[in-house]
Amino acid sequence: MDVIARYPEFSPLSLEAVQSIKVDLQQLHDGISELTFGSLYFFRNFYKYQISRFDEHTLLFLGEEQGRTFFFTIGAPLPVSTIKELYSSCAYWKLISESYLSNNQALFQNFKEPPTEDRDNFDYLYTRLSLSTLSGKQLHKKKNHVNGFLSNYPDFTLKKIDADTKKDASKILDIWATEQANLQETDYEAAQQALALPQITDFLSLILYVQGVPVAWCLAELAAQGTIAVVHFEKARTDFRGSYQYINYAFAQSLPEQVVYINREQDLGDEGLRHAKMSYKPEGFAKKYRLDKGAL
C-alpha cells in the first residue's frame, strides 16, 4: 500500500512518506534545502505539509505560511490544467529551482508573467574548503574568532549526536530558546523533532563540549548526490564566546572530500541574518523562484 495519497487527494506528510521518497530527494541537482528529507519532515508541522502523488514521475506538496496556502512539485512538469486546479486553493507556487525553470520554459509560456526570484529564500552556498580553512583576508575575522575560542577553551571535545549525546543537544537548544522573543516563529519545534528522530545517526552532526559542558551542536544531511551538505540546525550558547564560529569551522572540517558545497540555508529576509551569512563570503546561491496566482 502506498503511504502517499493519489492526486487529487492529499495526505499529511508522515515519516513513512518522506522515507519512501528519500532517494528521489537526494538525486535532485540544485541542492535546495527545503527539498530534503530533514527539512520536509522536521518542518512538517510548522508548514502543515501535505503530499500527493500525481503519477509515477511527479509529487505534489501543499503547505501554509502566514495564513496563505502554497504548493510545490518534485519531478516531471504538471499539465497546465492541473496547475490551474492547484491555484484554485493556493496563493502561489514556490521552490521552483533554476534547473526546473530552464528545463520547462515551454510550460511557463502559458502564464502572463514568468516566475520571480524569491531572494529571501535563496540558500547560501559556501565551498567546504572555504569554511574548513577560513583562509584569506576576507575571512580573517572569522579565523580570529576560532583562534579565540581555542585559546579560551583549550579543554574541548567534539562528538557525533547519537542516542547518548542528543540529550546534551537538547540542553543547548533549551538554553537557546530562552533568548528568543517569539519562540513559536523559530525552528525550535523543528529542532526538537530532529533530536527526537530515532534515525538521527543517519545525519551528519557534531556536538561541542567545553570541560564536559555541552555548548554547541549542528545537524546536516547530504543532498545533490552527496556533493552538498545542507545544514539544518546550528545552535550554541552565546556565553561561550566563539562557540558558533567554532562549530561552523569544525563541522566543515569533518566533512568528506566528496562534499563540494555547504548549504547554510536562507536568511528569510532578516537583515541581521543576511549580514551574518554574507560575512562568510558565499560562493553563490541555490536560487528559488515563485509564481503567484496573478500570473494565470
Residue spans of the language-model regions?
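Short Lys/Arg-enriched alpha/beta "domain-start" segment
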Residues: 6-35
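Aromatic (often tryptophan-rich) hydrophobic motifs at membrane interfaces
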Residues: 205-294
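A mid-sequence, solvent-exposed acidic-amphipathic segment
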Residues: 163, 167-230
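Short catalytic-loop micro-motif centered on adjacent basic/acidic residues
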Residues: 94, 159, 261-264
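Conserved donor-binding loop and adjoining core beta-sheet/short helix segment
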Residues: 23, 29, 33-103, 209-238
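Acyltransferase donor/substrate-recognition loop-hinge adjacent to the catalytic core
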Residues: 110-182
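Conserved active-site alpha-helix within GNAT-family acetyltransferase domains
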Residues: 102-116, 144, 268-285
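A conserved short alpha-helix in the GNAT/GCN5 acetyltransferase fold that borders
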Residues: 83-88, 149, 248-256
